[in-house]
C-alpha cells in the first residue's frame, strides 16, 4: 500500500504491475536522455556566437533529425503495446468475481459459488479498530487465492466508476450497461487497497477497495465460512 509522502510507485504484487514499473523506468530513462540533450543544445545556442552563412541546408542533418525521433518513439511504443496486450489477455481463470459500482460503495459476487455476494462499505473513522487504515478499510474485503488467475467483471448500477488497485496494476472503468473485464495474479500474500478513480459524485472519495490475497487453503476456509453464514 502507499506510504506517507511516497513519491514512487507502490510495490508490485502482480506480474502486470512489475511490467508497468519496468516500462516506467525505461521510458523515464529515455525522456531523461532527451531532456539532457535538449538542455545542452539550448546552452550551446545561447552561449556561442558562431555563424556560418554558407550552411543554409543539410540533407544529412534533416535525415538524422527525422530518423532519430522515429527510433526513439519505436523504443517507447513497442514495450507499451506489449503490456497493453498482456493486460487484455485472459485465459482459464481459476476464479471470477463480479464487481458492481454504486454511489458510493462496491458490491461483489463470486460467480463460481451459489449466492455468494456482499456489499463493501468504507468503515467510518469513528468506527475504525486499532490498526485500521483511515478512508481505505472496508467492512467486507475481497479475498482471493494467491498465485491463481482471477478474472474481474466490472460494471456499474448508476454512474461511471473505476475499479482500481495500484499494487496489482489494475484500473478498469465501471460503466452502466457495459461489462468490462480484467485479470490479475497476486504473487504474494497481503492486503492491497485501492479506490474509485473516476469522479462519481459527492462521496467519490469514500468508496475504497480492499483486497486480501491468501494461500489457497485459507481461501477455501474463508469461502466455507461465508457460505455457512
From Swiss-Prot:
Cofactor stoichiometry and binding remark: Binds a dinuclear copper A center per subunit.
Mitochondrial matrix face of the membrane: 46-59
Catalytic activity: 4 Fe(II)-[cytochrome c] + O2 + 8 H(+)(in) = 4 Fe(III)-[cytochrome c] + 2 H2O + 4 H(+)(out)
Domain of life: Eukaryota
Annotated Cu cation A2 binding sites: 196, 198, 200, 204
Annotated binding of Mg(2+), by residue: 198
Main location: mitochondrion
Membrane topology: Multi-pass membrane protein
InterPro entries: CcO_II, CcO_II-like_C, CcO_II_C, Copper_CuA, Cupredoxin, Cyt_c_oxidase_su2, Cyt_c_oxidase_su2_TM_dom, Cyt_c_oxidase_su2_TM_sf
An annotated GO BP: ATP synthesis coupled electron transport
Localization in the cell: Mitochondrion inner membrane
CDD domains, per the entry: CcO_II_C
A single Gene Ontology CC term: respiratory chain complex IV
Mitochondrial intermembrane topology ranges: 1-14, 88-229
PROSITE patterns: COX2 (PS00078), COX2_CUA (PS50857), COX2_TM (PS50999)
The UniProt record lists the keyword Kinase: no
Cofactor (UniProt): Cu cation
Residues that bind Cu cation A1: 161, 196, 200, 207
SUPFAM superfamilies, A to Z: Cupredoxins (SSF49503), Cytochrome c oxidase subunit II-like, transmembrane region (SSF81464)
Pfam families registered for this protein in UniProt: COX2 (PF00116), COX2_TM (PF02790)
Summary of subunit composition and partner proteins: Component of the cytochrome c oxidase (complex IV, CIV), a multisubunit enzyme composed of 14 subunits. The complex is composed of a catalytic core of 3 subunits MT-CO1, MT-CO2 and MT-CO3, encoded in the mitochondrial DNA, and 11 supernumerary subunits COX4I, COX5A, COX5B, COX6A, COX6B, COX6C, COX7A, COX7B, COX7C, COX8 and NDUFA4, which are encoded in the nuclear genome.
Name this protein carries in UniProt: Cytochrome c oxidase subunit 2
Encoding gene, per UniProt annotation: MT-CO2
